[in-house]
């Protein structure tokens, strides 16, 4: 049932105040090389912006395509969760001294990821062609969750194997 999935979705909810970040902040300040900081900084700056684009997709396009109340509730909840994640990453970026948005615009790798994501989002528009909608959902989900976020999480987890960024 849609309502059961909605409940599970809300039970997975977290706020930045529930995620311990202090040990990672200390690692950043004391244990990471400038190369490691550059890698992690690029990922974190990208996360904050990616979450914003993903929010736009769920709340703008998906809610337009599917007018069923349960799907609208799911999509707006997804969008709301993305704003919470974006806030968490923004606060972490600020704490690490990565809060200058113009730096994000100068980071070619991060900017290219976001531009590709926005191109996928924008290429399908708001028309209700079910084949195009299915294609959009598949590509957008695979790119954002698969290629962009999970590959970045894999890089971050590799630091944990080195006993860094354990939080």
Give the predicted meaning of each segment:
Residues 1-167:
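Non-heme di-metal
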């Amino acid at each position: 049932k849609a309502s059961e999935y909605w409940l599970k979705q809300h039970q997975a909810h977290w706020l930045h105040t529930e995620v311990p970040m202090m040990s990672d902040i200390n690692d950043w300040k004391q244990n990471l090389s400038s190369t490691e900081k550059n890698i992690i900084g690029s990922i974190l700056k990208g996360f904050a912006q990616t979450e914003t684009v993903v929010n736009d997709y769920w709340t703008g396009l998906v809610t337009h395509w599917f007018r069923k109340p349960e799907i609208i509730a799911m999509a707006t909840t997804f969008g709301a969760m993305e704003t919470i994640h974006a806030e968490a990453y923004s606060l972490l970026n600020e704490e690490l001294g990565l809060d200058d948005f113009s730096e994000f615009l100068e980071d070619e790798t991060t900017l290219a990821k976001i531009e590709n994501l926005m191109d996928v989002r924008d290429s399908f528009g708001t028309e209700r062609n079910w084949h195009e909608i299915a294609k959009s959902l598949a590509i957008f989900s695979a790119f954002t969750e698969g290629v962009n976020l999970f590959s970045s999480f894999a890089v971050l987890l590799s630091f944990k194997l080195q006993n860094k960024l354990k939080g």
